[in-house]
Every structure is written in C-alpha cells, then in structure tokens.
Amino acid sequence: MKTISELSGIHNDEVLTVIGRGKSLGRLRLEHLDGVVMTINHAIKVVESLQPDNPLYSLQKDHLFFYPQKATLLLHEREALAEIDGVDYEPVYSFDVERDFKIRWNLPSVVIAEKLGVLFGCKRVVYLCCDAVTDGNTDTFGIPPTNPRDYLFHGELVRKHASIPVEWKRIT
C-alpha cells in the first residue's frame, strides 16, 4: 500500500468533481463528470457503472467501505483501514487526516475530499449529489443515511476548511 503523499501534484490545475451519496446520485449521468472524479463511499458503484474516461478515485473514509472495480482506492487509516482485514486491491493509497492534512480525523468525507484536491494540485472542487447542501434533502441513494442532520452542516464545514474554491451543484 502506498501513501497519499505519492499523489502530490498529480492533477495540477485540474478540476476535482466530488460525487456524494445524496438521492440525486440516481440521476447522475456521464456528462456531469468533469475533470478528475472522486466518489464518496458507495457512490463509486454508480460512477463506475457509467464507465467514465476521467481519472477516478474512490474515497473510503469510514466504516461504509466499498471496493471499487477499477478506481484508485483512497483509504483512511484510522477508520476505513481499521474496519477491514487487509486490502486485496490495487492501486490503493492510505492517508491519515491528522498527519497528512492537519485537521481533525472525524471531519466528514466532503472536507477530506477538498484536502485531497489540494494535495492533487487541483484548482477548484465541484460537489455533486450532495443534496443536503444544495436542497436541504438528507435522503441518500442506495443505503440509509448515517447522520442525516449532520449532512446539513457539510457545506459550512467545507467552506470553513477549504483552501481552494469550492462549488456545490445540483443534478437536474
């Protein structure tokens, strides 16, 4: 397993599109995917089914762990990696939020995604399928929400910690 620092600057001046777990994930289409794509938890299943040509990352920060089919797997050492007994997948990169990004380990995946975008060298982050932020809808696609009321604060948490411009877009 490699460490996340090996991906430093790999996507310099590109846009990172982060795909959340909101109900609108069911309406996601290939044309919504711009630049480098990073999915959160099980959103990888929907995105990989679209067969994008974009560079694709699967962020697995917590216990809602899903193996991708082809995407580069990004595993949080304290949560996701601790939940599984070894990793039988390549390519995989591990990270520790406190060590690598100097922020609290228990911040939500949307915050960590922006920090990964900064590490990659991206110029901005666009969030899709984060319906709690765009519409106030805390329903999720495919599996039940973990902390639905917390989702409503994700936008503010990202804004508070962001180092590059971020944008939240609706899927129509």
Which sequence ranges carry the predicted segments?
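Metal-ion/cofactor- or nucleotide/acyl-coenzyme-handling active-site neighborhoods
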Residues: 1-172
